[in-house]
């Protein structure tokens, strides 16, 4: 019975899905796209100062090893032979920046996460010296000059971390986004690891020319980035190197398996949703929220605050495809904030129960601009607000407002995309962990006033990475021909409110967004000692107390 089961499975493909909140390793049947097994580990985020977001690159790498080991263990329990795994793909959180020592394999600083805001004053000073015109960066990269992207994070590390400066001087430093760090480590690390990235991840650094598909010398000179530390840029589907993890007893059977697919997480989801045609779009609900529309082989530049990015290049000799993207910084992260910071919920799943209890925000609106506002505003001065509170408001209303906020932000970027493309989307394909929340999906259909369509298997990001890996030349176990792609079962959510109510709620949300702007100004120092500022409140308290004591004595006539 067991041998018969093995015989029908055919070639398997694994996928590392390394996101902002968690790491997963998933294994798919390449003939049916069926998910056979997976394991997930939550990843810590560190907030050393206001606006700073970091992660430990070694913890990220260890989480990958753990997920591979546990998944292989589960496959063994299912009597599935892991030697059937013929390739591995990688999808990853984009923009997050790592610099490490190529001789020791040690990170030289924590990973600076895409959400991090410490580089705002760097962005402002750079914007004042853009050569020629304000489109210098955007015309080459498709991106606005923003704290979001890797170049300014790398610039900060070079300016402020002595270990990084010294390693660059001594030709020991390597830079990469999370995909580069993982592929280098998984293919041998300091003992011959492959230092590479793919076109989708490179296109998020602000150093990559999306027309020539090469690192841009002028951009590197503008940001003062030494090109010798940059990874080699490859397509999204080719053999980069072979797995070398013999130190891991349970995952050692994957030794020698090719890593042959690599896509930034949002591009991976586009592939996993099979959005291969011009005009097809998907929205992924993760830590942030990302709406991508395939624009085919042409670069479409937005006039409404969207990004132009590389969608995928599925083979060395295959054409590059582009996408328009609307990025929302905070989606699932707001649920984590309600859990970890406010203690309103004990688990992420609990928010659906709270929202269901009331079925309305009761006029409460939540703008979770914790890291400023991304598309379509690109407003770093914004901060989170909750408004419309009354004595009747309770945690259930706030939970509902948090879910609505995700949907309103999606509406904003969908409106921008419809204006850029000229043809409104008739429905929205969705994926990501938050799509398991049925109230969120129904709210999204109501607020967009179009149907929302969700695949029954929500792991489309990992699926996209697996498809790219399995289709690579030299692997060839996964066909991407339209006639060979597996049919996907979908769940459909139709709008249940009238258009007028949808518009009223949306217009009130827009008022709340306006109130969130202009809350902060750039701090004078990005690297100053925070302990200096910590002492100021105490100083003010002492001085004001002495003044009040003297005043009281004077008024009472005391000597």
From Swiss-Prot:
GO molecular function: ATP binding; glycerol kinase activity; metal ion binding
Family of this protein: Belongs to the FGGY kinase family.
Positions that bind beta-D-fructose 1,6-bisphosphate: 252
Protein name: Glycerol kinase
Lineage: Eukaryota, Metazoa, Chordata, Craniata, Vertebrata
PANTHER family recorded: GLYCEROL KINASE, SUGAR KINASE
A single Gene Ontology CC term: mitochondrion
Binding positions for ADP per the UniProt entry: 20, 24, 287, 332, 433, 437
Reaction(s) this enzyme catalyzes, per UniProt: glycerol + ATP = sn-glycerol 3-phosphate + ADP + H(+)
Membrane topology of the entry: Single-pass membrane protein
Transmembrane spans: 532-552
Annotated residues for binding of sn-glycerol 3-phosphate: 20, 94-95, 148, 265
Alphabetic keyword roster: ATP-binding, Cytoplasm, Glycerol metabolism, Kinase, Membrane, Metal-binding, Mitochondrion, Mitochondrion outer membrane, Nucleotide-binding, Nucleus, Transferase, Transmembrane, Transmembrane helix, Zinc
Major place of residence: mitochondrion
Binding-site residues for glycerol, renumbered to this chain: 94-95, 148, 265-266
Residues annotated for Zn(2+) binding in this entry: 501
Pathway stated in the Swiss-Prot or TrEMBL entry: Polyol metabolism; glycerol degradation via glycerol kinase pathway; sn-glycerol 3-phosphate from glycerol: step 1/1
Alphabetized Pfam families for the sequence: FGGY_C (PF02782), FGGY_N (PF00370)
Originating organism: Bos taurus
Subcellular localization(s) per the UniProt record: Mitochondrion outer membrane; Nucleus; Cytoplasm, Cytosol
Residues involved in ATP binding: 20-22, 287, 332, 433
Protein EC: 2.7.1.30
BP-aspect Gene Ontology terms: glycerol catabolic process; glycerol metabolic process; glycerol-3-phosphate biosynthetic process; triglyceride metabolic process
Function: Kinase that plays a key role in glycerol metabolism, catalyzing its phosphorylation to produce sn-glycerol 3-phosphate. Sn-glycerol 3-phosphate is a crucial intermediate in various metabolic pathways, such as the synthesis of glycerolipids and triglycerides, glycogenesis, glycolysis and gluconeogenesis.
């Amino acid at each position: 019975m067991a041998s018969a089961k093995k015989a029908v499975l055919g070639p398997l493909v694994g996928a590392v899905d390394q996101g902002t909140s968690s790491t997963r390793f998933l294994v798919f049947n390449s003939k049916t796209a069926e998910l056979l097994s997976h394991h997930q580990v939550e990843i810590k985020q560190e907030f050393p100062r206001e606006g700073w977001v970091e992660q430990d690159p070694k913890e990220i790498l260890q989480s990958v090893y753990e997920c591979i080991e546990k998944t292989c263990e589960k496959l063994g329990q299912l009597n599935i032979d892991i030697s059937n795994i013929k390739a591995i793909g990688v999808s990853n959180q984009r923009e997050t920046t790592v610099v490490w020592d190529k001789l020791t394999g040690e990170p030289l600083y924590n990973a600076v996460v895409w959400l991090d805001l410490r580089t705002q004053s760097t962005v402002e000073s750079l914007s004042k010296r853009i050569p020629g015109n304000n489109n210098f960066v955007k015309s080459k990269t498709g991106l606005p000059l923003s704290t979001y992207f890797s170049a300014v994070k790398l610039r900060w590390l070079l300016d402020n971390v002595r270990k990084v400066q010294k390693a660059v001087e001594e030709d020991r430093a390597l830079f990469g986004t999370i995909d580069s760090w993982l592929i280098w480590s998984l293919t041998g690390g300091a003992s011959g690891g492959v230092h590479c990235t793919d076109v989708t991840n490179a296109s998020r650094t602000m150093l990559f020319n999306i027309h020539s598909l090469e690192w841009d010398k002028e951009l590197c000179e503008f940001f003062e980035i030494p090109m010798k530390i940059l990874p080699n840029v490859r397509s999204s589907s080719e053999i980069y190197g072979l797995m070398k993890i013999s130190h891991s007893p349970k995952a050692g059977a994957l030794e020698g398996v090719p890593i042959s697919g690599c896509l930034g997480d949002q591009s991976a989801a586009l592939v996993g949703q099979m959005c291969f045609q011009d005009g097809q779009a998907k929205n992924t609900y993760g830590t942030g929220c990302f709406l991508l529309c395939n624009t085919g082989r042409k670069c479409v530049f937005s006039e409404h605050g969207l990004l132009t990015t590389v969608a995928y290049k599925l083979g060395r000799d295959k054409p590059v495809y582009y996408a328009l993207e609307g990025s929302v910084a905070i989606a699932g992260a707001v649920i984590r904030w309600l859990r970890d910071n406010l203690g309103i919920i004990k688990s992420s799943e609990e928010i659906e129960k709270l929202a269901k209890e009331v079925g309305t925000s009761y006029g409460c609106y939540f703008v979770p601009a914790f890291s400023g506002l991304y598309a379509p505003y690109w407003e770093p001065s914004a901060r989170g607000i909750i408004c419309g509170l009354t004595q009747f408001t309770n945690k259930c209303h706030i939970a509902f407002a948090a879910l609505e906020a995700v949907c309103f932000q999606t509406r904003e970027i969908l409106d921008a995309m419809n204006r850029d493309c000229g043809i409104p989307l008739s429905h929205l394909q969705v994926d990501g962990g938050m799509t398991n929340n049925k109230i969120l999906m129904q709210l999204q259909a109501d607020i967009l006033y179009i149907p929302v369509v969700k695949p029954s298997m929500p792991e489309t990001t990992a699926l996209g990475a697996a498809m790219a890996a399995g289709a690579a030349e030299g692997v060839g176990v996964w066909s991407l021909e339209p006639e060979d792609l597996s049919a996907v079962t979908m769940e459909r959510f139709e709008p249940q409110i009238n258009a007028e109510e949808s518009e009223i709620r949306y217009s009130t949300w827009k008022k709340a967004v306006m109130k969130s702007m202009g809350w902060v100004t750039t701090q004078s120092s990005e690297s100053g000692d925070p302990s200096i500022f910590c002492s100021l409140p105490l100083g003010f308290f002492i001085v004001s107390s002495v003044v009040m004591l003297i005043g009281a004595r004077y008024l009472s006539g005391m000597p």
